[in-house]
Amino acid sequence: MKNKKIDMLNGPLVGKIVIFALPLALSSILQQLFNSADLAVVGRFDSDKAMAAVGSNSSLVNLIVSLFLGLSVGANVVVARLIGQGRKDKANEAVHTVVLLAVISGFIILGVGEILAPILLGMMNVPDDVLKLATLYLRIFFFAMPFIEIYDFGSAVLRSKGDSTRPLYALITAGVINVILNLVFVIVFKMGVAGVATATVISNFFSACMILYFLTHEEEMLRLDVRKLRIRWKYLLGIIKIGLPAGLQSMVFSLSNVVIQAAINSFGSDGIAGSTAEQNFEFMAYFVINAFAQTATTFTSQNFAAQDKERCKKIYRLCTFIGLASCLGLSLIFLIGRHLFIQIFSTDENVIHYAMIRMWSVCLLELLTGVYEISGGCLRGMGHSMTPAVITVLGTCVFRLVWVNTIYAAHRSYLMLMIVYPVSWVITGTAVTVAYFITRRKEFAQIGKRRADII
């Protein structure tokens, strides 16, 4: 299964950006569709409470895995820079550090998750009628984490050279397996929530195996040899420098969503189910933005290492325009067919009511996330991961916590809770964009005066 890499350093950019970003967006959207299949199967063939149990875990899962997922961003930047500088031997050393880090981090998440699962769900005010099922789902789900980390980090390595297609192949294979097992475990064996979680573990095992196969059959620069697995500290430090702020940003970001989820939980199982159903479409719109943000990071990493400032500027403009336009188009499709889409998950009028509120106030405005995501992606590509992290934590996370405890507390309604999303996006987007242009001017003034080091 050969895949021609994308030359990010030469030639027209528009087609290459789209070709690179499209598999990323499709990968995330397909992953969400497969997650939606989990919800649809338990919602239709088990109960709304089972769907709420699965859905109530989403923010918590993101909170725990985000730190290590951020490290995969650092891995992508480190390997991409080495490729941009033409340092093939060093790139291969970095690959082996990345893969071993993935295995270690996956088992760390598994251990921590198993210990803290019931405690954290209790802190989130998960309703009593959902708590037992939610805990069961989460504890089984965490056994998938080593496989998820191998997939994420391995995909980051492949993307660093312009290959975003083969991770998509692995995801499609795993997703089909997941859907089939969902139907078998829930409908045939009546396993309910446990069946959905077990299917997730098995399907992620297959995606991890495929990524490892791709890496062991790569060209020499990125080829994985298990005998060479070791942590090389200079690359680990480079990964941490870029990835840790990104991971902490995502982790704190997820923490603010956990707080919002706790507020959503106060509206009962209908409010949880409605929010969970709508989020399937909201996330898909965001994944388009995230794909172009990842594209901006990888393309900027290689071209910044090659010291091509004009190409870096063009990457920012193209990723922003194409990303925002694509996200808006997808959001409008979801809005036009909102009733049909939501009824895939539930036909209960109360559930649909809550879903409609979230779709109008959040999904429609999802393109606003692109303003800070793509600017932040370019900053990370230049080696500045702390700046977007701090701004996002303050402008999005801290602001949301303040909103929930002040404005929402004084005017308690589902709509008032949802409005915090677009307001925080505007604040954060403005600040990150300003920071990007200031940082870009300073960095580009140094082009030719020093080497773009990986750490």
PLM segments and residue spans:
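Short runs within selected transmembrane alpha-helices of multi-pass transporters and secretion channels
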Residues: S72, I140-R159, P167-G175, V196-I211, ...
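Short alpha-helical transmembrane segments in multi-pass integral membrane proteins
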Residues: M1-A21, V79-A144, I177, V188-L244, ...
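Transmembrane helical elements of multi-pass membrane transporters/channels
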Residues: I19-D38, I140, A174, S203-S207, ...
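Small-residue-rich hydrophobic transmembrane alpha-helices
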Residues: M51-G111, I148-P167, Q261, G274-I336, ...
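Hydrophobic/aromatic residues in alpha-helical transmembrane segments
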Residues: L22, D38, A75-N76, L116-A117, ...
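Transmembrane alpha-helical segments of integral membrane proteins
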Residues: V398-Y408
